Amino acid sequence: MSLELKGIRKAFGATPVLDEVSLTLKTREFIAFLGPSGSGKSTLLRIIAGLESADAGEVLLDGRRIDTLPPGERGVAMVFQHYALYPHMTVRENMAFGLKNARVPKDEIGPLVDEAARVLEIDQLLDRKPEQLSGGQRQRVAIGRAIVKRPKLFLLDEPLSNLDAALRLRTRVELAQLRQRVEAAMIMVTHDQAEAMTLADRIVVFNDRKIQQVASPVEIYSRPANTFVARFVGSPAMTIAPVAMVDDSGAAKVKLGDGTVVQTGVPRDGLPPDDIQIGLRPEHVRVGKDGNGATTAKVELVERLGERSIIYGRLKDGLAITGEDIGLTDIRVGDEVPLTIDGARAHLFGPDGTGYHGQSA
């Protein structure tokens, strides 16, 4: 199975939503559409499903154009955020409903429902109604209703957003296990980066009507294409600040606003001459030992997370910076702490926001 999007454009009235979006999905690949609200990711999913029409562009499944077909003939199945289960029907009836509408023979419907229920481990729930199910169970029924159609492509519209934190984590694990048992590709829309990083083979980051980056979760995090991706992916967010270039040879050496010099691993060749910004992940800014550090920061907040502590501080020039310390840190708000900076893992960004990275990033 291959899905190809070619030059998709969409506007609602005078408001553009998607601008020349092109993408190729591979066989059995799990893709996450990640981005803020209003970035166009859900609209694109609905265009693939046939619930919205594109103003321009093409959608091809296995080389066959499907954007001219009605939703039921596209070979895709969509799982909605709000489950969309019929309350007066049992689980079995909900899962069989689409097959009956498609006039699938009755003697085929039962085995299809039973097999999907077995895969999802909800076979013991088939005679219950939605009101008798937990949120996670309802989500599995909604997925099961899609599975019985045996689609080439699953479309998941924020499938975990209605669940509480504990159930969301458990269902995320179940979804990861499910994709190993299902022979179809999947596209999931989410604004939750943890879901995208955990489940996806590749992440498509959206903003401002366009795709900002398409890459594996590791590459999205460690080699962001631009400042938007760098800030949007990662929690706490990356510290990004203007710097001055102080060395024109080899790897770039830059100076922060408080005078701290950072030797990066980014090759100087190819970098713009000025208007450079540095990007530092919190794990690459550490509290120094025995009072040693490249710079000092005044602590404004300490988040103790058990295995580590996140330190939010401010340098002498006023730059807000985020770093890490051990989980049992005794640092308090108002302390002046030394910080070490792992320059080899620092990122640099040009005037247009484009990212530049060293081999260690």
Region locations from a protein language model:
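ABC ATPase nucleotide-binding domain helices that frame the ATP-binding cleft
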Residues: 42-45, 141
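Helix-to-loop junction immediately C-terminal to a conserved catalytic motif
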Residues: 49
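ABC ATPase nucleotide-binding domains
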Residues: 30, 37, 71-228
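Non-catalytic connector elements of ABC transporters
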Residues: 236-240, 247-361
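Short hydrophobic beta-strand immediately N-terminal to the Walker A/P-loop
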Residues: 31-33, 45
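Conserved ABC transporter NBD signature motif
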Residues: 57-65
